[in-house]
Amino acid sequence: FFEDINRAGDGGLYPEMLRNRSFEDSVLPEGYIQQEDGVHVKTVSGWLDEFCNGEGLCRWVKGNNIPETEIPAWYTHNAKMELELTDTLNEHRDAALRMQFEKDGSLTNTGYCGISVKAGESYSLYLFAKAKEEIGLDVAIEYQGKVLAGNSLVVSGQEYTRYDMKLTAAEDCHEAQLTISCKEGGEVLLGFISLMPDNTYMGHGLRTDLVEKLKGMSPKFMRFPGGCIVEGTTPSTAMRFRDTVGPAWERPSKLFVWHYRSTLGLGFHEYLQLCEDLGMEPLYVCNCGMTCQGRKSVLLEGEALDEMVQDTLDAIEYAIGSKESKWGRLRASMGHPEPFKMTYLEIGNENWGPDYEKRYNMIYKKVKELYPQIKTIANEHVEKNGCPAECVDEHFYSTTEFFAERVNYYDDYDRKGPKIFVGEVAVNEGNYMGQLYAALGEAAFLMGIEKNQDIVTLASYAPLFENVNYRAWYPCLLYTSPSP
């Protein structure tokens, strides 16, 4: 089960090396209100969360010794930076970065607590920029003033233009930064920027060492993209398939419930490609037309609900539709003309009650009309209230003892009812989280699942990844840092 939590996506499995590459981290999404303390934000429905000017959790700032800055991850020397909220790269971008360089001024990005490079390996940088007057920029990956890789470009023209370059590292370094400097000074508007390693798994854009770790575990399916991020805390932050496909710079960024923005470089296409590369069955979780019920839920109604239902149907078409279909054509343009596999659809995440059942039924009926082969999964036992149910997702988080005492939990389950998917399971309470004692409790419970696999057909530990510098949930299965 993969969810973008603990910065597991950007800067993790998706190896973007620049944090806040879209310059939007400090921009409040629609439906959020900044609080007077300058740290918290509140949704219009009343959910309070830490924001910390877009840095996320305050403990991340303190624990990682992140210097204060107006625009997260970006710092200036002999230069002035400010967000441009009108003249952006495209309709999906909420901000651009306006730079005014003095002579020998510079702009620096510190990455996800450092940028990691290996001697002899190459890295691809691209940016979109425009300038009223021609301006020369030197780009370098550096550490304490020492240039590890460098290149240069000249920006000209008053329309956004894409500039590409290669940066080849001269030596290893795990605490580097990216610096853009301007010898003569001048003004430039940056619309989007990205720095990625050329070495990715099978050339498909994901971090090689992390995918190899997954491959070594022989996974049979992957549930994606969440998790609570599917629900969001406002209609604007609810996940929509269409926001996660197409060129990276045209995907709108999204503030996740786990306190940070993602640029959605790890999107629907990338998940499906990963499933294909590792032989995993895709299990897509769609938003069912409501935000997180544990975070002051908002219900979508009318056209907004219809739009969300259609988004799910469009996602399925993208995955398995012909290349002549609307969304199949986009898939083909992304390099995959043949259909992917699409095995399972989970309708909602951790949703319940009459409001959920209404929305579940809408999506279930539409999907079965068009794609009867898709296996659907419900969040609760909707069959008890007369709804059709093929499979139900049950989540378990508790103590070691809780799991050890439930080895026989599924022995007496009704074999005439729906199948069971244990979609999230982990010891996350007590004194032994992430230790052998906890693992023994989890193993005991999983043994009980194995002996009842006639009804429990799928199971997955949760969550999968943690970037060790950005912990929002503990424990996880695998731990990562900027350096492989």
Regions found by a protein language model. Name each.
Residues R223-P235, C286-M290, E380-V382, Y461-F465:
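Short, solvent-exposed turn/loop segments enriched in Gly/Ser/Thr/Pro and often Arg
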Residues K368, P372-K375, C391, H395-Y470, ...:
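Catalytic-core region of carbohydrate-active enzymes that cleave or remodel glycosidic bonds
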Residues H204-P219, F268-L274, A304-P339, T399:
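An active-site-proximal structural segment forming one wall of the substrate-binding cleft
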Residues F1-F2, K220-F224, P282-V285, T343-I347, ...:
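Structural recognition of the beta-strand scaffold that forms the well-ordered cores
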Residues Y479-P484:
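Conserved small/polar residues in nucleotide/adenosyl-binding loops
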